[in-house]
Amino acid sequence: MSRRRFDCRSISGLLTTTPQTPMKTENFNNFYTLTPKELGRGKFAVVRQCISKSTGQEYAAKFLKKRRRGQDCRAEILHEIAVLELARSCPHVINLHEVYETATEIILVLEYAAGGEIFNLCLPELAEMVSENDVIRLIKQILEGVHYLHQNNIVHLDLKPQNILLSSIYPLGDIKIVDFGMSRKIGNASELREIMGTPEYLAPEILNYDPITTATDMWNIGIIAYMLLTHTSPFVGEDNQETYLNISQVNVDYSEEMFSSVSQLATDFIQSLLVKNPEKRPTAESCLSHSWLQQWDFGSLFHPEETSESSQTQDLSLRSSEDKTPKSCNGSCGDREDKENIPEDDSLLSKRFRFDDSLPSPHELVPDLFC
């Protein structure tokens, strides 16, 4: 099976509606002050913190190049804008504030999520920072956001801890889903089949070049829940080939040692999602009714100010580590070669995590896995 090349001019599944947000041509710098804080960087985009000169409000400015690999990719950026507009009423999707356009770039002014990526909560060194009760709340909010997208026939296709932000870190804030550069519209007559996404988060159907459905996002939610609860990435191998083999064979460690501090209901939830056949995965809507998500301690969830002094000490530890861990991107950098989440110092990170988003096509690495 030959690899389908990424081509901005021929990708299916893009929203073609004209964005409702005005594309301003005024000088962005006349209205916003860029701070030194860079939130993310990719091959074709950079995200930086900015401050409105008129209100003093903080935002995330995402600078997207319109030409990539010599191709005009403006339609891809307009698709991302259209998805953000479609989800504007969803509290768990990052909010689009304004759009500016220059001769070479389109600038998205996005809501600023001060809590950073939930990836930081997946680090083994911060295992004591978040309880299973906290994870329940975060997963529920992710499901609510994804359910909203799926109701509108949008699949995200790159859900991962680096693309889910928090409104604040202490108290633990609300979920904001970002990075819609790989999202696609489904449900039309033509099937959507593409090799896309971050390697260790790819679903089996993407590796097999099978039709993409909303179930692909559900696989990723299973991975996110696994990482938040075990602080380990379930499928990453010692090399690229092993990673794809683990995914294809659904090699997941559910050992007592790995899940010693995880409830049986949480384990059941993950196991229901990490199944090879996408038709057997529950939908986002049905997941919201799972027994695990009903096990809430409402006191600790809605009264974070009453948490113990030790929790505040843990928060200080997290704040200190944030300087060494990946910063939030507040949106897609629009290409599978982006490395916006590679940390400057990986000494804190478990060897079970990888950050290379630019791996070759899985079909080039392990052709014997696919029929």
UniProtKB/Swiss-Prot annotation:
Taxonomic source organism: Rattus norvegicus (Rat)
Binding site residues for ATP: 39-47, 62
One Gene Ontology MF term: protein serine/threonine kinase activity
Segments forming domain Protein kinase: 33-293
Catalysed transformations (reactions): L-seryl-[protein] + ATP = O-phospho-L-seryl-[protein] + ADP + H(+); L-threonyl-[protein] + ATP = O-phospho-L-threonyl-[protein] + ADP + H(+)
GO terms (BP aspect): apoptotic process; intracellular signal transduction; positive regulation of apoptotic process; positive regulation of fibroblast apoptotic process; programmed cell death; protein autophosphorylation; protein phosphorylation
PANTHER family named among the record's database cross-references: SERINE/THREONINE-PROTEIN KINASE 17, SERINE_THREONINE-PROTEIN KINASE 17B
Function: Acts as a positive regulator of apoptosis. Phosphorylates myosin light chains.
Family: Belongs to the protein kinase superfamily. CAMK Ser/Thr protein kinase family. DAP kinase subfamily.
Subunit structure, as described in the record: Interacts with CHP1; the interaction induces CHP1 to translocate from the Golgi to the nucleus.
Protein's gene: Stk17b
PTM description: Autophosphorylated.
Cellular component terms (Gene Ontology): actin cytoskeleton; endoplasmic reticulum-Golgi intermediate compartment; Flemming body; nucleoplasm; nucleus; plasma membrane
Predominant subcellular localization, coarse grouping: nucleus
Protein name as it appears in the record: Serine/threonine-protein kinase 17B
EC number: 2.7.11.1
Gene3D superfamilies, sorted: Phosphorylase Kinase, domain 1, Transferase(Phosphotransferase) domain 1
InterPro entries: Kinase-like_dom_sf, Prot_kinase_dom, Protein_kinase_ATP_BS, Ser/Thr_kinase_AS, ST17B_STKc
Keywords: Apoptosis, ATP-binding, Cell membrane, Kinase, Membrane, Nucleotide-binding, Nucleus, Phosphoprotein, Serine/threonine-protein kinase, Transferase
